[in-house]
A protein has these predicted regions:
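Amphipathic, small/basic residue-rich leader segments at the start of a protein or domain
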Residues: 1-87, 108, 112, 244-245, ...
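Glycine-rich beta->alpha junctions and the first turn(s) of the following alpha-helix
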Residues: 2, 7, 193-286, 342
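Glycine-rich phosphate/cofactor-binding loops in nucleotide/flavin-utilizing enzymes
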Residues: 8, 67, 71-72, 92, ...
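Internal helix-loop-helix
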Residues: 46-117, 158-164, 282, 289, ...
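A short, Trp-centered hydrophobic/proline-enriched beta-strand micro-motif
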Residues: 116-124, 168
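Glycine-rich phosphate/pyrophosphate-binding beta-alpha loops
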Residues: 129, 154-160, 201-202, 341-348
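A structural signal for short hydrophobic beta-strand segments in well-ordered beta-sheet cores
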Residues: 138-141
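A short core secondary-structure module
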Residues: 145-146, 150-196
């Protein structure tokens, strides 16, 4: 097996030689206007052997380690290019199928996900079940060799351009809420599925809401055990939060940009203190991410909480430094409008604090009304 240092050096050289073909680094969600460029970039990555780096070779991967994959992500973040086109596909859906999928599901989906034949979206959150995902009400009722799915999902990233989705739905309404959920692989072109874009206060429409009306989903699209979807979903979300480690690079760049913005301006004592504190914390989180390597569940929550809270505070400080300019249509205004969403996406800051308190610090569990 190739050493990580050698692999990282080769990856950096390949990125430098091919960077001109890449779209800008858009993070976890590809904006609709960059889908074509993102697909082309993913195909180029796949052809060069940098897609599914830590996946088994029999499923189209390189058979390397998670540390090799982290090295690839780091080099991409430093270069300012996407490490994958479809994070939901390669990190979430792919990881779930590798761990819980039948041989038939793995054969059908994994190679197709690496080469962009299958593009995935996440169908978890609902209007009344976001952070409290266990309260979801979308139902999937068994009817012979199929499930009939009815309900609504929201905050679905990439729903408009995805042809597959990972879906959590309630299959046993009589069971305790976490025990009656199942996990499905859902074709997005089934009759009865309607996708509508959601306009955000930034003016963008990164997310969609998805409606299911008498959708007939084949029973063999169930992933993992019947009524065992909560465990599958939690494994998926841990992968999502672990993927945030490369956001440290983006945070570092944002702080460098803010330092340049502050040059030549008369900052207050409070603003100088806030800037120094953010830079110090950013250095600490960078060291933590580099030391951590593959991130376990609790550490992923710690890193996710720290980075998103720092992103929020840095956007506020940048707006304060910019002064009246922050009210104009530009990067400062966009950053201030976008920042609050980071404390919600991928699990709210409140949820991350509960995970850290209960699993890392051993504090009493938060009271659950449904268990009373």
């Amino acid at each position: 097996m190739i050493a990580i240092d050698e692999f990282q050096a080769r990856a950096g050289e390949w990125i430098a030689a091919n960077k001109s073909h890449a779209p800008r680094d858009y993070g976890a969600i590809c904006p609709p206007d960059l889908v074509g460029a993102g697909l082309d970039w993913q195909r180029r990555i796949h052809a060069a052997g940098y897609a599914g780096i830590h996946w088994p070779e029999e499923h189209g991967g390189r058979g390397l380690t998670a540390e090799h994959n982290a090295a690839w992500q780091y080099e991409c973040a430093v270069a300012g290019v996407p490490s994958v086109f479809n994070m939901v596909g390669l990190v979430l859906a792919g990881g779930a199928i590798l761990r819980f999928g039948t041989p038939e599901q793995q054969t059908r989906h994994l190679q197709a996900t690496l080469d962009t034949t299958h593009v995935w979206c996440q169908l978890f959150s609902e209007p009344g079940a976001g952070s409290d995902l266990g309260g979801l009400t979308t139902k999937a009722e068994r009817d012979g060799d199929r499930y009939i799915v009815d309900g609504q999902k929201v905050w679905c990233s990439g729903g408009r351009y995805s042809n597959w989705g990972i879906l959590m739905a309630r299959t046993n309404p009589e069971a305790p809420k976490h025990d009656g959920i199942s996990f499905f692989l859902c074709p997005m072109d089934l009759p009865g599925i309607e996708v509508r874009p959601l306009r955000q206060m930034t003016g963008e429409a990164e997310f969609d809401e998805v409606f299911f009306t008498d959708v007939e989903l084949p029973a063999n699209h169930l992933l993992g055990p019947l009524h065992g979807g909560w465990g599958v979903g939690m494994a998926v979300l841990t992968s999502e939060r672990g993927h945030i480690g490369t956001s440290v690079i983006g945070l570092e760049r944002r702080l460098e940009s803010m330092s340049k913005l502050a040059e030549g301006r008369q900052l207050s004592t409070s603003q100088r203190q806030r800037l120094v504190q953010l830079i110090s914390k950013g250095s600490a989180f960078k060291a933590m991410a580099q030391r951590q390597g593959p991130i376990a569940s609790t550490a992923a929550s710690l890193l996710k909480l720290g980075i998103t809270e720092m992103m929020f505070e840095s956007a506020r400080l940048r707006g304060d430094i910019a002064g009246p300019e922050a009210m104009l249509d530009g990067p400062e205004a966009f950053g201030m409008l976008q920042a609050p969403g980071g404390r919600i996406a991928g699990g709210t800051s409140q949820v991350q604090r509960n995970i850290i308190g209960e699993r890392l610090l051993g504090l009493p569990r938060e009271p659950k009304p449904e268990r009373s």
